[in-house]
């Protein structure tokens, strides 16, 4: 792109003009020194300022010629590389070159704008030409805002001017609408521009006729002509004179009104001495004037003398306007009109004083005749014009000959002598005709050529003070001011805003001066505003002046729109060009990258080929090595395969041999198994044969024993017949012996022939009976002569009813004392006998541990008593655990169909121990039985104190946790022991009173004779409910059962794991549960232990001398004691009975001391009811609704076995 021409300034003003540096990076990074550019041979040395590199912060100036002076007239610009260049200005030929360059530039601009207009589409053209009324007035308002004084007075003056202009616009538009009803704002504006182009203001009739006569394409052609005319600036130049004259007239009107009011001058104009001289005209303005020459100067401009043109330009800058464009326009207009040129010559030579004097003389001569204010009177006829010329010449010559030459300090004469408004109007008309170049002005100039130049210059300077304001309208005429693409690298260098900058500076100075002139008359402006347009200028003149202003505004709007469109189009082209260049640059980069890539690809391909060759060579080597390795591996594999086959063959042979051996071993094992099975079969057969033989032997033994018993019975009968008297003497002793014997024997193994009622109904007699049972059965059969044989054993209840109704139930055991050993229990034993129900679970799972202590005898007994008690019991202390085990095995053979009966009741007590000689005689046995009863003090129990008292209280335990043993003591309907408590329901008795039986040998006594109790004590309120033969056994059994419960409870408290406990400690604990400790002797305690041992429910240990020291109860015994079967449902047919004395002679129903009531746990099995009693049952107190006693009204089913000692 080309470089812009540098801006030229003169004097002390320096203008910097920076050309666009190259966009290349190399030119910015490198340091280059610019060489001096020689425009003319006489140019002065240059001063170059070299910019430092980007890294340096402070640039340094370097002088090429240090001795040369810094030029006063210079041009400063920037070189392509960024260096600042200061050049000396050649005053001689710089203006002509600049003028030519400016003409060429403007010519290029016009041609480009015309080409752009022709390239636009119709829509775009219509868009540019569509100018609204608001846009027109916005131009004038913006001009007033930017270029006029900002004071309040000026602002108020602008409002009526704008209103007047708007009214003029509306009138013109209405006139156009009257001429052409289809006219709009666009067509109206185009017509105004067309009139401006033609230089005439034709009437409405001519415009209407021209529009109708032309074709449809006339509007488009008119648009093109109007736009091209606006581009050429010719119309603007033509209207500028009228606008200047209009403003000048307005200022003169204000001044005349003020003079009428005899006020000091409002505007203080500068004297000619304040203006710069012609010699001091800045050369920058002369150059700038050359830049603003229009394209339509005409052919005369090239022929004008350059020196004369320079002189006129200096004069115009000094007196007309300091703005270069206005001065240039003035010179151009002066060269076009000879009259104006003659006036300028007069002003230059004699300062224009002759012309001013001539005008003053002419005005003064016409004061008597008023000058009409209408525009028609301002037009002179030929005779009037000639007369005016004569008078002006004569007056001017007279005044110049008589008046001296005025100094520069004298005020202008036209400002002081002209007082009347009509004179002013005439002067303005004449000045207007002079500016139009009429003949009267030419003659005046010719007559004044020889006058004083200084006076003329002074007059012209005063007259032209208002001219700088006229230049304000030319700001927007230069269409190059609003377009500046200096920074763009794609600028076409069409426009130059340096002229606009200098023009703005001059405008600022002028506005400042204009504002100072109005500082003194702000208070006067308000009175003058009412008379703005009250002059004699008629409506037509105002319309013409307004038309010119509107035409200028429309022209500027069209120029702006066209320039904006051109700029947009150019910007779009620049963007496209930028995109194209960017694409080209990117393409170049891509090409470079592709070249580099191709080069790299070639290098890579070459390297790859070399690598492939190396790899191929290496691969061949590897393949050769692999082939050799494979051959070696194949040979090795072949060798291993042969070796594997050999090993497999050897292994196969070995497996075959092993299989044969295993097969042989299996056959041997099968043979052994067959032989073993044969042996087992033989052994089983032998066992069966042995069992058969044993069964036969047992049967033979039973037959033998039966025969022996029969022989004994026969012998006993024979002895009874032989000794009737002896039997009567020993009746009482034998009665006691039988009771003691039955007490120990019937608790475990009741006799089969006696209707106890406590053996289960369906229970058969055990096959393995002891010898003692047989002996006692024989004795019972011998003594029971009067008992009927019709009583049945299976359905009769127990004959211990008298004892059962006062029997002592089991006592609960306190769970808090389970974990205590016997030593702690002995130290602190509970006084009241009250134990919870759940002790059974703890005792049933307790481990057995032996706790043995060596105590010589029970505490509280003398050694003699203990020794005698043990010594007087034959056959007991010699027992050993072996015998106990033997007896236990014998007892276990007995089974019940509905469950097991507790051990203390199903065991058979043997009075004679385990080793009883079957060959003993009956008399010996009877003697032993008597001695045992005597030693155990049962012979005098009628007078002894009871063991303990039984409490009848029923409030100790809840009702739901109690139970009874059952209907009877050994009821066949219960799986366990029946309740020791009578639970039959009370009812009316239907039986006759029974007589007590006095002796067990009394066979003549009736079976219905019952004793009140075991010892024959009767009571008035006692009702016997059992025969006397059965009372003794029942009472003994109840006594034994209650004592057994006390012993078991004491043992449970001492041993929680089922181990051995010293009997002396156990006896002391038993006494702690009794209220009357003297009723339960140590001999009775030992007897209970022996009875339990014979029933295999207790184990005892003896010392070296055969005395028992320790005992232990088995777990089944503990469980059977704590768990009792439920009472069988059903009522009893027995009548209600009175409370009677029990075994220990205490009234059961009225006793309040002794043991507390305890619950009895029960389970229902078999055919018994599952209902559990819910009430707490007191000891010795039966519950209502049930009965545990035998119904004595029943007949015995086996009369043959009813003949025993119990009847």
UniProtKB/Swiss-Prot annotation:
Residues 469-507 have a biased composition (Acidic residues). Residues 7-16 have a biased composition (Polar residues). Residues 25-36, 511-523 have a biased composition (Basic residues). One of its GO terms (biological process) is negative regulation of translation. Residues 564-727 form a coiled coil. It is found in: Cytoplasm. This is Stress response protein NST1. The gene is NST1.
